């Protein structure tokens, strides 16, 4: 099926983390819902293998999403390692941002426990989502924007601006959620 979408500049190959590219390097490698089946101890090696296949300035996007892509999170990595962590939520029926906990990348999914930064982030997002419930009358987007602004005001290093938040996205540096 994927080969039906091939066109100049876009191709699909069967392969693993080694990313077979016939001697070329990838600008972007997107690996969603791949590492979930692996042990957490295997993540670093898989990341290193894929990062080694990146062109200078290239990026690896590794994460997980639900079946229809409405709840997702990913780590963006460069040649030197993880750079950012992003969550993306369909805001229309969102009960709590922590729904993303079941779709965290393998490097974080077992770290959503008290004392870990990812747990702190998700707990804070839920608290702020509840705090800004009154803004729901203006729509979930306005509520999410208020959450992002409040998160930043509380000292979280939220990256980006309203243009991404309107899409239900929120990005922080990897260091803000990296396992302790």
Give the residues covered by each predicted segment:
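Class I SAM-dependent methyltransferase SAM/SAH-binding core
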Residues: 1-20
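A short acidic, Gly/Pro-enriched loop at the edge of an enzyme's catalytic core
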Residues: 18-29
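Residues lining the SAM
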Residues: 31-35
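A short glycine-rich, Lys/Arg-flanked "PGG" loop and its adjoining helix->strand segment in the class I
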Residues: 36, 42-57
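A conserved mid-domain beta-alpha-beta active-site/ligand-binding segment of alpha/beta enzyme cores
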Residues: 72-73, 77-146
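Conserved Class I S-adenosyl-L-methionine
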Residues: 125-180
